């Protein structure tokens, strides 16, 4: 799916319509061993099913959701919106 990089839309910070620039959100840094430490503690428990699922989830969705950040040209603040499913997203100039 092709989408324009710059378009006029509503900015919730300015409370007005301005030109917004869309950019793909990069993945953030992982926060150390927090999740893994909890998982290890659950797995080493002596009672129950050791933190395992009864049926392992398998398979991937055919498409991914878009993850875009919209930056206002007037105030410079960025905001997020709910994404949609698209096979491939290309931002046009």
UniProtKB/Swiss-Prot annotation:
Required cofactor(s): Zn(2+)
Lineage top rank: taxon: Archaea
SUPFAM superfamilies: Zn-binding ribosomal proteins (SSF57829)
Pfam families, alphabetized: Ribosomal_L44 (PF00935)
Cofactor note (record): Binds 1 zinc ion per subunit.
GO BP annotation list: translation
Binding residues annotated for Zn(2+), in chain numbering: 11, 14, 72, 75
Zinc finger region(s), C4-type: 11-75
GO cellular component, one term: ribosome
Sequence segments annotated as region (Disordered): 24-62
Keywords of this entry: Metal-binding, Ribonucleoprotein, Ribosomal protein, RNA-binding, rRNA-binding, Zinc, Zinc-finger
One term of GO molecular function: large ribosomal subunit rRNA binding
InterPro entries xrefs: Ribosomal_eL44, Ribosomal_LSU_eL42, Ribosomal_zn-bd
Subunit structure: Part of the 50S ribosomal subunit.
Function: Binds to the 23S rRNA.
UniProt cross-references to HAMAP family, sorted A to Z: Ribosomal_L44e (MF_01476)
NCBIfam families: PRK05767.1
Family statement: Belongs to the eukaryotic ribosomal protein eL42 family.
The protein, known as: Large ribosomal subunit protein eL42
Organism name: Halobacterium salinarum (strain ATCC 700922 / JCM 11081 / NRC-1) (Halobacterium halobium)
The encoding gene: rpl44e
